[in-house]
Amino acid sequence: MSHHEHDKKIHKCPTEGENYDNPQTVSLAKETTDLIKKEINLSKDAIILDFGAGTGLLGLNFINEVSHVIFEDVSNGMLDYLQYKCDTQGIKNYTIFNGVMEEFKSDKKVDLIMAGMVLHHVEDLKSLFNKFLELLKPKGYLCITDLKKDAPMFNIGGHKHHHVMPHRGFDPEELCKDIKSWGFIKTEIKSVSSIIFKGDNGEKVVSERFMIIAQGP
């Protein structure tokens, strides 16, 4: 196990991730994974990489249906809470990688990579997608959910300061063109629910999202 991987048991509930797992994030994650299950036929032997996994809301929805889930993130607090959830639920078929994707190495290729609400944090998308292709099995899938370009949530609270934010959302059609230029052979855009945040003055801020399912060569 590399020094980037979690190998500690967590018996006390960490608070950072607990705050993240609210009814909306849980519901949106389930909507995403239900749609993936409808669109992609994964075998019991499948391996999934949950990129920017946070507290594991996407990957944990597959944990009983595939052989292994790899959770990647750079947030200690989120991953501590994910570790706590796995420990308390007796989950064994997973790996937690605490570090940047460029440093991730695996001797096994993966069937599906999920990137839920994380791409707008990544500066060099081309390098990231090259890494994804390196990790995917032939004809493997990448599933992205993110915010549409200039979503209102980029103007409120946390997304104004303590986040790294190289992209203010994406135009899904343009992103599909880029994804194909980076080596994926098929892309499809799907509709998903909007996300609602509380604005700086307590108002409701609705931001549209999209899903892209891409297939590697």
Each language-model region and where it sits:
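Conserved class I S-adenosyl-L-methionine
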Residues: 1-42, 58, 81, 88, 143-170
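Class I SAM-dependent methyltransferase SAM/SAH-binding core
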Residues: 49-103
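A conserved beta-strand element that flanks and buttresses the S-adenosyl-L-methionine
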Residues: 114
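A short glycine-rich, Lys/Arg-flanked "PGG" loop and its adjoining helix->strand segment in the class I
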Residues: 127-138
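Short alpha-helix
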Residues: 168-183
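Conserved S-adenosyl-L-methionine
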Residues: 184-195
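Core SAM-dependent methyltransferase catalytic element
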Residues: 195-217
